[in-house]
């Protein structure tokens, strides 16, 4: 399948550069996955589309301030390091700029020596393996020296780094935020609970592979970067109860979707406690096994994420919705607006 089938025209001014002042005031497009019908709402209206017995699945990963600026100890040359994946102990897979300056044995110093890293090898797609040395607690030092790794299409400086975290972020380890969750406030989550909507939590640590462009000409040639996920026994039990009672499982974001669909694929359609690495790639033709609805942001043209949404509805519905979003001047990408995709007409006719 040609990746150009998932292209659309996006004016640059619709790429959201900063978050809205209030999270839940973002717009919400409600898309019927079967009919393609569209409604234009605001995110707080999600309350009226969720019913008692439904369950939201939220990714409680926390974004690391994963971008570090340092110098080569031997020459003083500036080096930028982006942490991607912790391998074992203090060893990390990273991306480095400029990579050609960092060879095996190169030592990089950060924060006047508060943190040091030695290159111990190469990694996938031009990356480097670094081993860090420090006194104290690594994540406390990272919090002091690191910057939030905002996507390259965001040019503005983020004034408040908490705005690139969900309000329920807990498990540190992501190189990017699960952005569909950025629209929820603690108050909105409480209202959902009072309505009888369940909240289930999983972890998937988002790597840059999620956002890497598809380099192949056809979808089938593209391979996803693996990301770590975890689902507890408590979450699995809650989701299975929801299914047994006739409720809907609605994932908040493509990361939650990938986690549930990975587990269901690996366990004959069942949801159970599991941890591991997933490189699942969902595009039209994929049959969903676990979810009934999806809340997600508006994604980049020709990205694996718009392909996932197209798999859940269909390509024509999704591209029509995206063109409508452009026409109505929705805000796109990480700090942009949201879409709720489900079989809404069926629910109304129950």
Curated annotation (Swiss-Prot):
Please tell me whether the keyword Transcription is annotated for this protein: no
Q: Which GO terms describe its cellular component?
A: cytoplasm
Matches recorded under Pfam families: Queuosine_synth (PF02547)
The UniProt entry lists the main location of this chain as cytoplasm
Q: Which GO terms describe its molecular function?
A: S-adenosylmethionine:tRNA ribosyltransferase-isomerase activity
| The entry's keywords | Cytoplasm, Queuosine biosynthesis, S-adenosyl-L-methionine, Transferase
Function per UniProt: Transfers and isomerizes the ribose moiety from AdoMet to the 7-aminomethyl group of 7-deazaguanine (preQ1-tRNA) to give epoxyqueuosine (oQ-tRNA).
Q: Taxonomic classification, please?
A: Bacteria, Bacillati, Bacillota, Bacilli, Bacillales
* Gene Ontology terms: biological process: queuosine biosynthetic process; tRNA wobble guanine modification
> Per the UniProt record, which EC number(s) apply here?
2.4.99.17
What protein am I looking at? S-adenosylmethionine:tRNA ribosyltransferase-isomerase
The family annotation for this protein states: Belongs to the QueA family.
